[in-house]
Amino acid sequence: VPDSAAKADRREQFAAWLTDTSNRQFAKNIANRIWKKMMGLGVVEPIDDFRDDNKPSNPELLEHLTDEILRLKFDMRELTRIIAYSSAFQRLAMVHDPSSAETYRFAGPVLRRMTAEQIWDSLITLVAYNPWSFQRPTAADIASVVDIDWSSANLAMAQTAADKYEATYAPGTYSKERQTLSGFEGQLLVRASEIPTPLPLGHFLRQFGQSDRESIEGGRTVATVPQILTMFNGPITHIMLKKGSVIYDNVVSAGPAQAVDVMFMAILTHRPTPLDRDLAVKEIRSANSVEAGYGNVLWALLNTREFLFIQ
């Protein structure tokens, strides 16, 4: 135990020992996890299997990352920023076969599918105007309901304010109201971080590999048939093609001349190539209605590998 924590309680002693600069093992684990989050592949894989006989693919890189996280006093946000500004991270994603005997040298990030949460949040931005609507009320929200001038308030006024707060922001009442305002066919259209977990097996997030929270590294990005069917014909796809969704309203208001650009920019974050534009316009014109044509193009873009994978 470091001398600085010699007289502290045991929890503080444990924390001090764990993060001490002489105990590099913990720092290596943290640095390796952040590297994998950014680059798609850890220097040590699996990331929760640090053993003497499981050698890092690049020992020098792991030691450098460990030195950095210790220098930064475990400031994970700063280490993330450093990696994000590196030329390795900013290169085009590379295809890597995990079963290959060849060591990956990190010429760039590994091409990988978005996590379940990333896919969900990407879709929600195309659907909901306020994806944060399920958050707890802010102090300003509560103040607008319980607005009392305590210099002149009496017991009756305080009781009225308390009743108003209970009717508006009591846990059960508030949660039910949020679900009513933000729900569609039993699914809350809010960011993944706002949804209580673990979710039922049939939910979009679980189908795409969200962790069941029963074990470390329980999340998966393995492709399955239900995932394909969900993207083809699931509730989230249906609501996106209806009036009132963000993408639908923006495409319709843009008009035929700009609609294709809006769809490509919103879903794939780039403008269409001349060939892409010709194919999209042809599909829109051949549909039963302009709106149906827009829906067909949106559906096609959502089901591309370009949308699902981080490049």
Predicted regions and their residues:
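Long, His/Glu/Asp-enriched segments that create or flank divalent metal/ion-associated functional microenvironments
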Residues: 127-198, 203-209, 214-223, 229-230
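Active-site-proximal alpha-helical
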Residues: 35, 227-235
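Primarily short, surface-exposed interaction patches in extracytoplasmic proteins
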Residues: 1-161, 214-218, 238-294, 301, ...
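Residue-level micro-sites within transmembrane alpha helices that shape
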Residues: 226, 302-305
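Residue-level detector of short, conserved catalytic/binding motifs and their immediate flanks
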Residues: 226-227, 295
